[in-house]
Amino acid sequence: MQRFSNILLVHEGRPRGRKACDRAIDLASRNKARLKLLEVAEPLPSSGVKYQAPDGELDLQTLVEREIVTKLAQKAEELSGDGLVVESKALFGDAFLEIMREVHHGQHDLVLLTAEGDGGIKEHLFGSLSRHLLRKCPCPVWVVRPARRKKSIRVLAAVNPTETHPSARNLDRTVLEMASSLARMYSGQLDIVHVWQQAPRSGRVHRNVVAKWNAELLLAAEQRVTEMLDHFDFSDLGPRIHLPGGPTGMRIVEVAEERKVDVLVMGTLSRSGLQGMFMGNTAESVLQHIDASVLAVKPEGFESPVKFDS
């Protein structure tokens, strides 16, 4: 995946963050990219109590800040090596705003973080921070499912070739490029899904007629995907193509579950080229139900609604 040059890893100090850390190190090393560890902590309420330190009396907030900065710098030094120099930065405040501020001022082109939940039947994988970043971060965001890292992974690319706007086609191209790069990088397998909209059922139309319409819609979907894939050489990957009909978000999740997907690569806006803060219904539905890591990309021209002074 030779496209990232300045990667930001939102550091998770617990063991569950190891997988995201490993992915960030891999990407930075392969891309000869810069890598920065960022940890954001909430400020402590002021108590007025002072504590004795070697250089004088300090309040609890200052002591905590020093400890976080020191431990993060040590972690960055441990991860550095073989030509990779890892930087570190500790910030204090609202996690979402501080991450967005760092992306803006640091000109990062990829953010990695560990999903807040553990996934599975009883728990959503993506929490408030993940969702906010997926909606509003101007660069690609990779939210990593906290699970044991595998040497080989299965990657699912979700595309929509029915969109004819140039920025939509570029978005699909980016999704396919990233997904195929990941599959090759980790000796994995590539699946591609396009969900087509079925003809609506109606009591006034015979079911055989509806079935004929759906057969024609499926054929058209096959042709669109074939034409799109003609621009790529995936012969080494032998991707499996999925063309389910129905509600887009749920069909993507069903394919991901059936194929035991590790990473879903998808665009996050319903209308490419749209500027603003809202993800499309498809992306929202996927994030509510998916139990895999998600690498989300924005279309060209996307502008984050969160602004900072230069």
Task: Describe the function of each predicted region.
Residues 204-263:
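Glycine/small-residue-rich hydrophobic helix-like segments
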Residues 90-99, 243-251:
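Charged docking surfaces used in two-component/phosphorelay signaling
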Residues 53-56, 106, 130, 158-161, ...:
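Short, hinge-like loop/turn segments at secondary-structure boundaries
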